[in-house]
Design a protein with these regions (language model features):
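Short helix-loop-beta junction
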Residues: 37-51
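Short, well-ordered coil/turn elements that cap or connect secondary structure elements
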Residues: 45-47, 99-101, 120-121
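Cofactor-binding loop segments of dinucleotide-utilizing enzymes, especially the Rossmann-like FAD-
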Residues: 27, 55, 109
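Long amphipathic N-terminal alpha/beta scaffold segment
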Residues: 1-36
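A structural preference for short, hydrophobic beta-strand core positions in alpha/beta folds
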Residues: 52-53, 106
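Short, solvent-exposed amphipathic alpha-helical segments in soluble enzyme
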Residues: 38-42, 89-93, 122
Length: 152
């Protein structure tokens, strides 16, 4: 049913592309992709170019992370199964990213259930609903762009 209405949702009220790109990923091996899919529709409706990924393991996670230029990577973490691995891998992935200003946002059930386990360097924790997530992520990039333009 969600798939049937997806195209209608995306086209209804859609804004022009905003030029921002987003990789939305679940944790490796996750069975909980519906929430990420639904969130992606909110970002698309706001004009974002969204890539969805559901990696099968940590190697796939790394490949997806570094597969293209992204302004933002959003990680939806449903369990604590890979928290330590992801936390340890992020600095390497950020250092090797094509975009040196890449922003990483953390969300999903773990952001609400155990936010204290997700306070990692160079990441922003998202709690709340999809509309709030889109607003916070978009505003963060807008503020970064404004700071850069003021220094030029």
């Amino acid at each position: 049913m969600l798939h049937d209405y997806s195209a209608e949702f995306v086209t209804e009220g859609r804004l022009e592309p905003n030029g921002y790109s987003l990789l939305l990923m679940t944790e490796p091996g996750s069975q909980h992709g519906l929430g990420v899919f639904m969130l992606s529709e909110f970002f698309r409706r706001a004009g974002w170019n969204v890539t969805l990924a559901n990696p099968v393991d940590m190697n796939d996670f790394k490949r997806n992370f570094q597969s293209d230029w992204f302004d933002v990577v959003g990680l939806s973490l449903a369990t604590d199964r890979h928290l330590i691995e992801i936390q340890q891998t992020l600095p390497e992935l950020l250092a090797g990213s094509v975009n040196s200003a890449l922003r990483v946002f953390l969300g999903g059930p773990m952001a609400s259930l155990a936010p204290d386990t997700m306070t990692w360097p160079r990441t922003v924790l998202l709690k709340g609903n999809a509309i709030e997530a889109v607003e916070k992520v978009t505003q963060t990039l807008f503020n970064m762009e404004r700071q850069i333009s003021q220094t030029l």
